[in-house]
Each structure stands twice: as structure tokens, then as C-alpha cells.
UniProtKB/Swiss-Prot annotation:
GO molecular function: 16S rRNA (adenine(1518)-N(6)/adenine(1519)-N(6))-dimethyltransferase activity; RNA binding
Protein name in the entry: Ribosomal RNA small subunit methyltransferase A
EC number(s) per entry: 2.1.1.182
Gene that encodes the chain: rsmA
Function: Specifically dimethylates two adjacent adenosines (A1518 and A1519) in the loop of a conserved hairpin near the 3'-end of 16S rRNA in the 30S particle. May play a critical role in biogenesis of 30S subunits.
The reaction(s) this protein catalyses: adenosine(1518)/adenosine(1519) in 16S rRNA + 4 S-adenosyl-L-methionine = N(6)-dimethyladenosine(1518)/N(6)-dimethyladenosine(1519) in 16S rRNA + 4 S-adenosyl-L-homocysteine + 4 H(+)
Organism: Herminiimonas arsenicoxydans
Main location class: cytoplasm
Family named by the database record: Belongs to the class I-like SAM-binding methyltransferase superfamily. rRNA adenine N(6)-methyltransferase family. RsmA subfamily.
Length: 255
């Protein structure tokens, strides 16, 4: 029986064999990998990953798809977690000593940003992440200071990860086709992020970008004096999108 994609789950199923092949090449699954796929859907990518790994985990919210997966795959090869990825504790997935988790998925575009922040909590225990996301989101993730797309997502994720836009995927590669272009991003956790309290960095970045058209002196008024900004190497007349990650970290360390 054909599964009807559900809007509330943000379901757009990848159906293009060429794109799937390129994703698998980028991931390069190895037999001993501890692999977890978020939102396997109709298992187009799952099947190809299982050709390369001995066993893998999937996290799927749609109960109909969970039942389909259970009927299709050997439970010793595919371990299914019927759960919301936003609430799922990825640390519960057993990983052999000396190994780290590899995370992949065609992420639902309607929850992509909160899901990326949720996964960032697991960064020290992750080898890498390969995700299909809305192209615009990936461009924001990898944006450099001074660009229009540079913002909170850029700063917070670049503090945690080395990131690369691998390639762009057209809407025609999906069923149903989304209204936007998609892209594959590779995320490799930084072993030693710049020393900083994450909560303080979040506070500074959130306040700075809440009024991105203003100069940073006005954005952060009440949090930092003009002298604080200068001592952190920041011209008070700069705008939030021109300030580097290192400069935001320097500010957070002054709180």
C-alpha cells in the first residue's frame, strides 16, 4: 500500500537514484560504523546504508512508517526507535569503546533548526553528520561574517562544527517535490571549540541578531559598555553580521 506523505511531518521522500548514490559516496559507510538515520521515510537511503554497515539505527516519528520498516528489515540489522528526533536522547544508542556516532538524514525542513541545536548537545560523541536540508538553511550554516545569510545559526553551529555544503539537490529529486532547493551538508564536530560558556554565547548572539540592522553598540546596550566592545576587539559601529565567531566568544567570556 502506497504511503501518502504527511505535511505535518514535513515528509518529502527522496526518490532520485543518482542523488542517493552521491549521498552514499559522501557518507562512505563502513561495516563497523555506529550509524543512525533520522527520518528514514520509505527507506531509500536506509537500504543503501545497510549495504555498507553491519547494523544501523533509525529514528522515525510516523507510526505507519515504523510498521513498514519493521515488516521490511531484519531487526538484528535495523534497530528502530519510534520517537520524535527532537525529544530523542541520542546518547542512549550504544557505541563501542573508542568509536563515535555517525548521524545522517533527510531532515524535516519544518524542524531543521531546533533539531540541529538539539544534536549539537551530542557533538563530543559524534564522528560526523550528513544531512539533507533546505538550501537556504545550509547557506546560513556555512555563511561567513559580512554576508547577508550570516546570523545566529552560523555562529552557534560554527562554534561546534566544521561544515561544508557538499552539493545542491533540485526539487525534482523528491516526492512530493518541495517548493525550494535542497542541499547536502557535512558537519564534523570541532574537537576543542573555543573556550566559552555555551549559555552565555547563546545570550550574546541572540541579543545581537535580534536587531541586526542596528550597530552592535545599540544591539548589546545594557549587556556591554562601549569599552567592553573595544577591549574585545570590536568596533562599536560594526553591525552584528560583520562580527566573527572569535569576537562573539570574546564577548561571551566577558559576561
Amino acid at each position: 500500500m502506497k504511503h501518502i506523505p504527511r505535511k505535518r511531518f514535513g515528509q518529502n521522500f527522496l526518490t532520485d537514484d543518482g542523488v542517493l548514490h552521491n549521498i552514499i559516496l559522501a557518507i562512505d559507510p563502513q561495516p563497523q560504523d555506529t550509524m543512525v538515520e533520522i527520518g528514514p521515510g520509505l527507506a531509500a537511503m536506509t537500504r543503501l546504508l545497510l549495504d555498507g554497515v553491519n547494523q544501523m539505527h533509525v529514528v522515525e516519528l510516523d507510526r505507519d512508517l515504523v510498521e513498514r520498516l519493521k515488516k521490511t528489515f531484519d531487526p538484528k540489522k535495523l534497530i528502530i526507535h519510534s520517537a520524535d528526533a527532537l525529544q530523542f536522547d541520542f546518547s542512549t544508542i550504544p557505541v563501542p569503546a573508542g568509536s563515535k556516532l555517525r548521524v545522517v538524514g533527510n531532515l524535516p525542513y519544518n524542524i531543521s533548526s531546533p533539531l540541529l541545536f538539539h544534536l549539537a548537545e551530542m557533538a563530543p560523541h559524534v564522528q560526523d553528520q550528513h544531512f539533507m536540508l533546505q538550501k537556504e538553511v545550509v547557506e546560513r550554516m556555512v555563511a561567513e561574517p559580512g554576508s547577508k545569510t550570516y546570523g545566529r545559526l552560523s555562529v552557534m553551529l560554527q562554534w561546534r562544527y566544521h561544515m561544508e555544503l557538499m552539493f545542491i539537490v533540485p526539487p525534482t529529486a523528491f516526492d512530493p517535490p518541495p517548493r525550494v532547493e535542497s542541499a547536502i551538508v557535512r558537519m564534523i564536530p570541532i574537537e576543542k571549540p573555543l573556550p566559552c560558556d555555551q549559555t552565555k554565547l547563546e545570550q550574546v548572539v541572540l541579543k545581537a541578531f535580534s536587531q541586526r540592522r542596528k550597530v552592535i553598540r545599540n544591539c548589546l546596550a545594557g549587556m556591554f559598555s562601549e569599552a567592553d566592545l573595544i577591549e574585545a576587539g570590536i568596533n562599536p559601529q560594526m553591525r552584528p553580521e560583520t562580527i566573527s565567531l572569535a569576537q562573539y566568544v570574546a564577548l561571551a567570556n566577558r559576561l
